[in-house]
Structures are given as C-alpha cells and as structure tokens.
UniProtKB/Swiss-Prot annotation:
Binds 2 magnesium ions per tetramer. The lineage of its organism: Bacteria, Bacillati, Actinomycetota, Actinomycetes, Micrococcales. Its main location: cytoplasm. Residues 426-501 form the B5 domain. It is found in: Cytoplasm. CDD domains: PheRS_beta_core, tRNA_bind_bactPheRS. Mg(2+) binds at residues 479, 485, 488-489. GO terms for cellular component: phenylalanine-tRNA ligase complex. It comes from Leifsonia xyli subsp. xyli (strain CTCB07). This is Phenylalanine--tRNA ligase beta subunit. It comes from the Bacteria.
Length: 847
C-alpha cells in the first residue's frame, strides 16, 4: 500500500518536517512492513509558461519542429533559474497554440530518467539549428500519465495559473508516498483510513475518521431496485451482505481529473483513466471500500446479485469475453450479467464520455467468493484484493456518499434521492478474554488499563464479566475472531518491545526418540566410513516400482499422483533404489566415476483400502467413520535405507593396484549400518529380478526369529547397460524400521580381552553353488566358543581346483577369557570348524 503523505496528513496529525523514514518507523512499530519511498523525482526550476508564438520548421528527416517563444516569468522579471523572462525552446509536439499555458522545465531542472536513479537533467543545448533554453514537458515526462505525443496544456486540467508559478506544487508533484507491505489478515490497512489509524496507534497523534467526515443521507423510501438472490452460497455465506446505491445526474464525464487527484492516484500506484473512474478509485484508496460506477442510462431495470448460470458469458471492462463458472458472483440487470462482483465491471454499462447519469455502487461481498472468482479468471484487481481480505461492512454507505460528493464537486453532477440500502450484516459476537490469558500467553503482566486501552484504541467495545472481559471487535477487523487475536493486538498496541528477550527453558524429558537416535547413528556411521548421504525425489515411474519394489516379477501396487510434475514419474516410490541410481547416473555424466552414496527415506506401500473413501467438501465436517476410512487409505510409509557403490573403492596408486567396488562393499555398508544399532545381519544367497543371479543376497537379522530386512547384490549386467551404468554396480536396501525394531534395547560392550589372540587361516574347497555365507556359519558353529571372529578373505576359482569348485579362505581369530591359548588348542578349534563345514557341505581342507 502506497500512502501519499499529504493525504495521510488530512486524517492524522503529522508534525511539521515529518520524514518518510519517521512515518515508516512508526508504522513498523505496529506490525506493518517497510517497503520503500516513492516521489515524482522532479527537482529544480519547473514553472508555468505561456506560449507567445512559434514558427514551424520542417526538417530533412520528415519531422516538423516548432521554434517557440515562451514566457516563463512576469514581463520584466527574472525567471526561476535567474534568466530572461522569455525563452526560445525547440518542441516537437504539435498540440498547442499561442496563449496556451504549459509546464516548462528550465535549465538545471531534473526529471525522472528512463532508468531508476538516473535523472534526466535539463540544460540549454543546440538542436535543430537553435539553442533550446529549456523544455516544454509532456504528462509522461512529469510522471502524471502515459501521454507522450503532445505536451501538457494546463487548460485541459482546468487550470489557468500565473506565468512563472511553481508548476511542481501546482500539480502536486512535490508529494512523497511511503509504501508498506500489508499482511493478509489486515485488509483494513489497504486504505488511507486504515494507515492513518495505525499511525495514530503508533504515535498518539489525533485521528480523524474520513468515513465520519461525509454526510450520509438515508436512501429514498422507493429507491433503486436491488435484490440478492444467492441460491448457492459458498460455505453458507450469502455473496453480498451490504449493497448501497446512489444516483448522480447531469454529470460531465469529460471534465479533467484535477491535478491533485491525478498526483495522489499516481503516487498510490493507480493511473488516471477518467474523472468518474478516478473518483471511484480515489474513494477506494481513501476508505478501503471498492466502489463502482454504472452508466445509469445503459441499465435495464434493477440490479440482482446472483450466481452465474450454465453457459453464461460476460465481456469485462478489459474487452475480454469470459466464460462464467457456477460459483461466480455476478451483478446483473434485466439484460443479463453486467459485472463480476467485487472483481471487474462489464463493458455494457461502462462509464464513457457520453455518460450523463451515474449509478454508484458500494457493496460488501463474501471474501471467499471474490477470491475464488479472481483466481479462476486470473483477474486480480485492486477491488478483489480488498474484498478477499475483508472490507468494513459499515463503511459502504459513507463510501457511496463520498463518491456522490466528489461527483457533485468535480463533475458538476446533482445527487438524486433515488438510491437504496440493503444491509443484512450480523452484529459481531463478543469474545471472552479471561483476565489471566494475556499474561500467560505473552509472558508480560500488562496492567488492566493497558489491556482495556489497547482494545479500545483498535475500536473494540469492552465490557466486564466475571473473571474476564467481553470484547466486541470493530467492524473493520474481521480477522479478530478469538482471544489469541486480542492478545496479539494488545501486545502490538502496547509495544512488542515490552516483551522481554528471554530464552524459554526446555521442559525435561524431551529430546530425540530411540528410533530417531538410531536412525541418526546409522546415517552418521555410513558417512564416517566414506559414503555420501543424498536425497532423491520420491516420484518414479511404474516400471521402476515394478522392478525394484519386489524381488519377483509381476508388478507391485503403488500410489499414483493426481497431478504429477512429470508424466514419466507419476507414482510414489516403493523402493529407494530408482532415485539413487538416477543420482549415480547424473554424477557419472559429470565425471564422478567412483561413487558410494546412501539415502534414508520413506517408501509408500498402499494398502487395499487406498482410495475407498472420498474426501468430503471443505465446508463439511467429516464423520468418524469417514475419517477412519481416510486413515485406512493412507499408504504404509516405512523408512528404508539404501545404498549404491560403483567404480573403485581404492584408486590406483604407485605400488598399489585399484580395487574395484562390488557386492562385498555393499555388504560392508550393511554391516556398518547394522553394527551401529547392535544387530548382526547375515547375507543369505537369494534371487531378485533386478540383480545378478549369482551375486544376490537376502539380508537376515541373526536373531532367533531371523527377520528378513532387505537385500543386497549387483545389478544384472543387462539392466546396468540399459541404465547406462558400469557393468558392476553394487546396491543394497534395508527396511530401517524393521532393523531398529530388532535392535537390542541396550548395546552391551564386551569385556576387554586380558589374554592374547591366536590367528589362523582356513582354506576350504566347496562346490561353486555353495554360498560362502553358509560355509562361514558352519565354521563358526563348529569352532565353538573360542572363535572370536571369522572373516572371508579370499574366494578363488581356477587352476589347481576341481571343476565346478571354489576355494574359500577364512581368517580366524581365537581367544580364551581365562588363559593364553596354545597353538594346539587353536588348531583343534579350527579343525572342528572345518569338520562341521565338511559335514554340511562336503568341504575339504585345501592343502
């Protein structure tokens, strides 16, 4: 909202010399936001001149210029710049005559330039063979309009000032506007009336309500016919609660808008259109009540406010034919729609140069109806901006009277008794404000006088009841609906600076839940071991869900998006891997060939009830059964952990070959994540439709129940090629919620070993088809309690081995708690482990 200071000063006392910065500071103190300062940007000598004579001189470029003699000061007097009273000025316009009064910018003056903060400085300069000693200005050059084809003739504004008079003050170009940002809940501040009231709150200056400064005669008993026939109100709120009409006859619509009004409208951000339209805009800015003028002679019968009919259209003032929606609120007469209520009028009743009789409308429309209509037709307007935030229903009568007053004063019209008032506004319900509510909420012990004074200052009616105040909010504050709103107003008016800067004390017993702590531990552990955490979009294609969402082919159910960002990714993910593989592909394209990434996030697994219950309309309170059905339809959203490893885990260095990433690295990440929560995870050979048939493992928690947590493996070569990925890409995915569910309540650290360990290697030859993990478990089982740790260190297939067999080498570590083991004891335990593997899988010790 832009507020010209001269206008603001009419309704609140401004101390002489008050600066825009001081006005901004006062308004900021009551919750408005500073945006900027606006001026016309005119400096230096700009005076009224009179054209004495001119000579037209055709030029070689086809243009005709006028070499003018212009009087810029009284005869024999010095001009404002100290020069002669008559100046020779070159002018390219052709719309003026000898004797016309014009605006002359003398050398040394500065006008707004084509670029911000770059003024256009006037100087005497030679052009077209003459020294032009100044410039005759157009309306656009002065910032008063868009007309640049001709110069501004003051007679067209109804002005006949003295030659040499200061044109800046004459045209109101010396005014300044402060701009503030108005929050959506404070629509009343979209007016000079509202801003003046807020300035009075901030400074204590006297406030004069412009709505009370204009006489509002009662409408004629047999006034203009108006009816509201809203048969489909939105949220049970009738589209119009107040509708005021007034009639003004014998209006001269061709009269110019006075320059003071043009200047104020321009500073407020609204361009001048015509006198009648400018008056309605001026009153809207002044009082915050949008008004509209109709050409009375073009109306057919009375006015009816109703919803649009099917197939109905309307040509609006911008000459656009609009197909109307059944929710659109219309202003109609006997001929049909003549305006979109609260948004824009229709072309059929537009005020024009030939208009003689004007019907003035000031109404109060339902904010939701206006907001929906404006958005539906992509037609934001100054009127809709105010209506959708809430307009004072009690100001409509005053606004209509103010428009009538200005039409009489400026357009020569005569007020007619033919008018009407439809008012179905309900009185606001009082809000109960307990005595202890504000200090408990805000933390400041405001006195009773401060609370009462603040509530009265904003226009509230305050009365006493037992243990509380009853407060009736003012009609211009529809945002005040409960006691918390009143508490905020008290804090705002008394001063936010009264609230102490004290950090609240955190209540005991709060903090991270066990699940949150473990999830963070998992993520931190993987990051500590060199992996990078990433976040992928949760939207994927159906084929990706089918491929990774289940080990077996056949597709999986998934949640489809109603309005996807991308038609190729129209489903919520059932696996984290599609997003991670997409991230890997993008990184590879940018030259990052060695990659280890992971993500923790939710996947979406729909149940059978998905979509079985329809969401009720916004205005209806859903039943418990409906809510239960909606809740049942929400997909299950477990948290998963997934990772992708490709390239090399160790790069080639002098004396050290590169180590390629593979399944073992994915399993290592699984072990790291599981160890972070105290769970042992065992890989069990398995199959998955997206993974290499011989390089896939199911991940099982090593507890008594043996819970399946997920899978790991290498992408099938065909899929890797299809995705433009390297041949070997290791992946894993775990149900993180399930992993945490089987985690022990406490991770008990083992005792520190007091005796040395004995280490030995064991190489076993088994068939190719025997999983290494199964052999490892057999050795551990057979070796007994002395075996402290076992790791697979080699998987050899080749020369020296029988066909279809492999050699698995394990590193064994033995230790006893009460003694130092002998080599014989360690060897005996190793042999027992080998024997158990031989018993189960036919394993033989490789010599």
């Amino acid at each position: 909202m832009r507020v010209p200071l001269s206008w603001l000063g009419e309704y609140v006392d401004l101390e002489p010399g008050t600066t825009p910065a001081e006005v901004h500071a006062a308004l900021v103190s009551v919750g408005l936001e500073e945006e900027g300062v606006h001026t016309f940007g005119i400096e230096g000598p700009v005076v009224v001149g009179e054209v004495i004579d001119f000579v037209e001189e055709p030029q070689s470029n086809g243009k005709t210029i006028r070499w003018c003699q212009v009087r810029v000061a009284a005869e024999g007097q010095k001009a404002a710049d100290g020069g002669a009273d008559v100046r020779g000025i070159v002018c390219g316009a052709g719309n003026f005559f000898p004797g016309d009064k014009v605006v002359v910018t003398l050398p040394g003056a500065a006008l707004p330039g084509p670029a911000p903060l770059t003024p256009f400085v006037i100087a005497a300069r030679k052009t077209y063979g003459h020294v032009s000693d100044g410039m005759i200005a157009s309306a656009r050059e002065l910032g008063l309009g868009d007309d640049h084809d001709g110069i501004l003739r003051l007679s067209t504004l109804g002005l006949d000032p003295e030659v040499g008079a200061d044109a800046v003050s004459l045209l109101g170009l010396d005014d300044t506007a402060v701009e503030v940002n108005v929050t959506p809940d404070r629509g009343y501040a979209f007016s000079i009336r509202g801003i003046a009231r807020e300035y009075a709150h901030a400074t204590g200056a006297a406030f004069r309500d412009p709505a009370e400064a204009v006489a509002s005669p009662p409408p004629h008993a047999h006034g203009f016919s108006v009816a509201v026939e809203d048969r489909a109100p939105i949220r049970d709120r009738v589209g119009a609660s107040v509708f005021v009409t007034r009639v003004v006859r014998d209006v001269d619509a061709t009269r110019p808008t006075p320059p003071w009004m043009v200047a104020r409208l321009k500073l407020a951000g609204i361009r001048s259109i015509s006198l009648v339209v400018d008056i309605t805009n001026y009153v809207m800015l002044e009082l915050g009540q949008p008004t509209h003028g109709y050409d009375l002679d073009r109306l057919s019968g009375g006015i009816v406010v109703r919803r649009a009919h099917a197939g109905e259209t309307l040509v609006t003032l911008d000459d656009q034919t609009r197909a109307l929606h059944a929710e659109d609120l219309l202003i109609t007469d006997d001929s049909g729609a003549i305006g979109l209520a609260g948004v824009m009028g229709g072309a059929s009743t537009e005020i024009g140069a030939g208009t003689r009789n004007v019907l003035v409308e000031a109404a109060n429309f339902d904010p939701v109806s206006i907001a929906r209509t404006a958005r539906r037709h992509k037609l934001p307007s100054e009127a809709s901006k105010r209506f959708e935030r809430g307009v004072d229903p009690r100001v409509a009568v005053a606004a209509a009277a103010r428009v009538v007053q200005l039409l009489e004063q400026l357009a020569g019209g005569t007020a007619d008794g033919l008018g009407s008032l439809l008012d179905e506004t309900a009185d606001a319900e009082p809000i109960r404000l307990p005595d202890d509510y504000i200090p408990n909420l805000i933390g400041v012990a405001f006195t009773d006088d401060e609370v009462r004074g603040a509530l009265a200052e904003i226009g509230g009616s305050v009365s006493d009841t037992e243990g509380a105040l009853l407060v009736v909010p003012p009609t211009w504050r529809p945002d005040l609906r409960d006691k918390s709103d009143l508490a905020e107003e008290v804090a705002r008016i008394v001063g936010f600076d009264r609230i102490p800067s004290v950090l609240p004390v955190a209540p005991p017993g709060r903090g991270l839940s066990r699940a949150q702590t473990l999830r963070r531990a998992v993520a931190q552990t993987l990051a500590d071991n060199g992996a990078t955490e990433v976040l992928a979009f949760p939207f994927v294609g159906a084929a990706q869900n089918d491929l990774f969402g289940s080990p077996e082919p056949g597709g999986v159910p998934a949640v489809k998006l109603a309005n996807p960002l991308d038609a190729t990714a129209a489903y919520l993910r059932t696996s984290l891997l599609p997003g991670l593989l997409g991230i890997a592909k993008r990184n590879l394209a940018r030259g990052l060939v060695d990659l280890s990434v992971y993500e923790t996030g939710t996947v979406f697994l729909p149940g059978a009830a998905l979509g079985s219950e329809t969401l009720p309309p916004g205005a209806a309170l859903p039943s418990r059964e409906t809510l239960a059905g909606l809740n049942a339809g929400i997909p299950d959203q477990p948290r998963h952990l997934a990772g992708v490893v490709l390239g090399h885990t160790v790069r080639k260095q002098p004396g050290q070959p590169a180590v390629a990433a593979g399944l073992a690295d994915a399993l290592a990440m699984v072990d790291q994540a599981a160890a972070a929560v105290g769970v042992a995870v065992e890989p069990v050979q398995s199959r998955h439709q997206a993974l290499h048939p011989g390089r896939t493992a199911q991940l099982v928690a090593g507890d008594g129940v043996r819970t399946v947590l997920g899978y790991a493996g290498e992408l099938s070569p065909a899929l890797a090629a299809e995705l433009d990925l390297p041949r070997v890409v290791a992946v894993f995915e775990l149900d993180l919620d399930a992993l945490i569910a089987v985690a022990p309540a406490e991770i008990v650290a083992g005792t520190i070993a007091g005796f040395p360990a004995a280490t030995q290697d064991l190489s076993l030859v088994v068939g190719d088809e025997v999983p290494a993990g199964e052999v490892l478990r057999a050795v551990r089982e057979g070796a007994g309690a002395l075996l402290e740790d076992i790791r697979l260190v080699d998987d050899y297939r080749g020369t020296g081995l029988p066909d279809s067999s492999k050699s698995l080498t394990f590193a064994l570590r033995f230790r006893a708690d009460d003694r130092t083991l002998t080599a014989a004891e360690a060897s005996e335990a190793k042999q027992a482990g080998a024997a158990r593997a031989g018993q189960l899988f036919g394993a033989a010790i490789r010599e």
